[in-house]
Design a protein with these regions (language model features):
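Conserved nucleotidyltransferase catalytic core and NTase-mimicking acidic/glycine-rich helix/loop elements
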Residues: 9, 104, 110-224
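Metal-dependent nucleotidyltransferase catalytic core
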Residues: 1-18, 34-40, 46-88
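Short, polar/flexible loop-turn hinges at active-site or ligand-entry regions and domain interfaces
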Residues: 49, 55, 102-112
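Ordered, amphipathic secondary-structure segments that act as subunit-interaction surfaces
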Residues: 84-107
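Helical scaffold of the NTase/Pol beta-like nucleotidyltransferase catalytic core
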Residues: 1-25, 185, 218, 222-224
Length: 224
């Protein structure tokens, strides 16, 4: 597995050389950011420049080619103005799941309202519902099912925050804080992430049932 501290040092040195005095924010998302990485985990880097051009994208691409484990590097690259005016319902999870390396997203996060979080929950659950039905009928893919459980885990983080005002970043902590049905969904996600066997029909039905309760509710379900 990657020694992430050493990787970040090399990454930030290369970033500053590629974009001197232009990095407004840099951070780490995903499993490495949460301390939950496995051998298969991507390195999800977040970079917000003062502004972003097509030429900057090419420069960043060339910079990544100089780094170790290039095939594992992914993430988010944007200009500051674009991020500050992003769809607010998408900013909740984005900001909460990002560990700052340089700068802060607090100002961006402060613009996110309870209604934005509710919209993120509804949209996320609807996406999981549609994906689950589609996969049960057509692709019948274990990998797609795993991805849908991952998406559901993010929705559950938002649901718990909307109920309690507490963002639980680590899934192992969140699973014990949720009601039984939601906890079971998250437990399945954690088992799959750790290499557990896919029981396609049962796991698809579990996810379909949970997501359908949110997708089928008029407006937003009461999270109390």
């Amino acid at each position: 597995m990657i020694e992430i501290t050493e990787f970040i040092k090399k990454y930030m040195t290369a970033l500053d050389q590629a974009f001197p005095d232009r990095v407004w924010f840099a951070g780490l998302q995903g499993s490495y950011g949460r301390g939950e990485a496995t051998e298969a985990s991507d390195i999800d880097m977040v970079v917000i420049l003062d502004q972003l051009s097509a030429s900057d994208i090419r420069t960043y691409d060339a910079m990544l080619d100089t780094l170790p484990c290039r095939e594992l590097i992914c993430g988010f690259l944007s200009g500051r103005q674009e991020l500050e005016n992003w769809e607010p319902s998408e900013l909740f999870q984005f900001c909460r799941d990002t560990t700052p390396i340089r700068g802060s997203l607090d100002q961006v996060l402060s613009s996110v309202t309870s209604a934005d979080i509710a919209r993120a929950i509804k949209s996320g659950a609807c996406g999981v519902y549609h994906g689950c039905v589609h996969n049960m009928l057509y692709e019948k893919s274990e990998d797609i099912l795993k991805g849908l459980y991952k998406s559901a885990s993010f929705v559950l983080q938002a649901v718990h925050f909307q109920r309690t005002g507490v963002y639980v970043r680590h899934m192992a902590d969140l699973v014990s804080a949720l009601p039984p049905e939601e906890s079971a969904v998250l437990q399945t996600f954690m088992e799959l992430k750790n290499g557990g066997a896919v029981v396609f029909d049962a796991m698809s039905e579990q996810l379909f049932s949970w997501a359908g309760k949110w997708a089928g509710a008029p407006g937003m379900m009461d999270t109390e």
